[in-house]
Swiss-Prot record:
<feature type="compositionally biased region" description="Basic and acidic residues">
    <location>
        <begin position="125"/>
        <end position="136"/>
    </location>
</feature>
<feature type="compositionally biased region" description="Polar residues">
    <location>
        <begin position="415"/>
        <end position="427"/>
    </location>
</feature>
<feature type="compositionally biased region" description="Low complexity">
    <location>
        <begin position="341"/>
        <end position="353"/>
    </location>
</feature>
<feature type="compositionally biased region" description="Basic residues">
    <location>
        <begin position="1"/>
        <end position="10"/>
    </location>
</feature>
<dbReference type="InterPro" id="IPR039213">
    <property type="entry name" value="FAM90"/>
</dbReference>
<dbReference type="InterPro" id="IPR041670">
    <property type="entry name" value="Znf-CCHC_6"/>
</dbReference>
<comment type="similarity">
    <text>Belongs to the FAM90 family.</text>
</comment>
<dbReference type="Pfam" id="PF15288">
    <property type="entry name" value="zf-CCHC_6"/>
</dbReference>
<feature type="region of interest" description="Disordered">
    <location>
        <begin position="1"/>
        <end position="41"/>
    </location>
</feature>
<feature type="region of interest" description="Disordered">
    <location>
        <begin position="74"/>
        <end position="136"/>
    </location>
</feature>
<feature type="compositionally biased region" description="Polar residues">
    <location>
        <begin position="184"/>
        <end position="194"/>
    </location>
</feature>
<feature type="region of interest" description="Disordered">
    <location>
        <begin position="153"/>
        <end position="239"/>
    </location>
</feature>
<protein>
    <recommendedName>
        <fullName>Protein FAM90A27P</fullName>
    </recommendedName>
</protein>
<feature type="region of interest" description="Disordered">
    <location>
        <begin position="259"/>
        <end position="459"/>
    </location>
</feature>
Amino acid sequence: MARHSVHHQAQRPPRAKNPQEQQRRPMGQTTLPAEQEESRVKCKNCGAFGHSARSKTCPIKRWSGALPLQALGSHKEKENLKPAKAQLPFTTPGPFTTNDREKERSPSPQQQQSEAPTQTFPRTPQEKMQEAWKEPAEDCLFLRHPTMPLPVHTTKKRSVLGPVSTGPPPVNKPEMRLLCPSGHNDSPQLSTCGPTKGHGRDVTASLLPVLKSSHQTPTLSARLPANRPDMSSHGALQPAMQALALGPGLKSQAEIKHPDADAKPRPQQVRKQCGQDSRTQAPDKEPAPVPTQTFQNPAKKARFSSFQTPALRTQLPDVGAVQTLQPPRTATGLGSKEAPKATAETAATKTATLQPRVNLQPAPSSPFLGPAQGCPVLQPGPPIHVPGRPGSVTFMRGDKGQKSPRFRMPPTSRPPENSASAQSPRFSRQPEGQGPQVSTSVLYEDLLVTSSSEDSDSD
């Protein structure tokens, strides 16, 4: 009991000696905060803070009639005997905050009612402008997605124009170009560099209106993609160059001889023929100067390249044919994969190579196709202009055995005249086994004369 009395005496608050001083003190000083009381008061029976040994809350002193412990002060969270009641202050703000957030997100019906009349009022100019801005936005949304069906509609529209390209090539096509040698262009060369789709058609039949309508005499050279990988582009240039040299002086023999469609020219023979048979003239028409070229002299390569480059620059690669160009084996730059070995040329080989052969099938990657190839018939005529060999003289033997000297003028001195080949475009097709009507001895003598004259000019 003494312990309890001592403890109670220490626990009593100090009292003022005078009752007046006790009244003067404020009431807040007598009641200490709960934290200070808890730190000071400690039950000696149970050792818990917050109550004294005399308090009814002490479970040891009054076990049977003890009250349930309650949280006091800052220990409410620690002494959580009733979780439902203890979590109320923390859980209750949750629904209020969520409700507030939902209210902030979704406007109240009063606000909706207040905003609704503003939209139902007559439209102001600003609202009309806003709607005008909304319409292109919808169009943009519509234009974002139909990217896939657009090509379908365009292909269907273009399919109607498809058969136009399968027919004969038009005259006023941007791919049609006029190529001619240096000098004035009186007899241009019509070349279609673009690929045409008529594989099985006759090119000469499709381009006859072009030749009839033109007042000039174009040497026709068309290009067709084919499936024959027999010759390269160098070999395919030979019919075109021969047609260029023989343009006005072609003699039509389609009615006399029926050619073989699969006849192939030998490159060496074509080159020899270009050198010899280029000075040909039609017997029915008046003699006209023809641009001729001889591919015999290797020293004249630099001069001849200026005339050949326009035809080579206009080449366009074929879609279906892929072939590599071989370097030229001769000085003229018209080599071919099928070119024979020209090591030792004898008189027999020269006479054999003078027989002309025409390639009637298009080469796989040939930029030019020479559909017009004539059988040469030598007749005397006016002087012939040869580009690249000014001042040279050639002797030519006619049908009666007469030799007539011919002066070769520079290409800029006098342009070639028009011939009548455009009025009657008949092309002769000759098989591989047939030769010219002129005897080979006459042609061989002409070959020797021209080669000797060229050697003298080069010296």
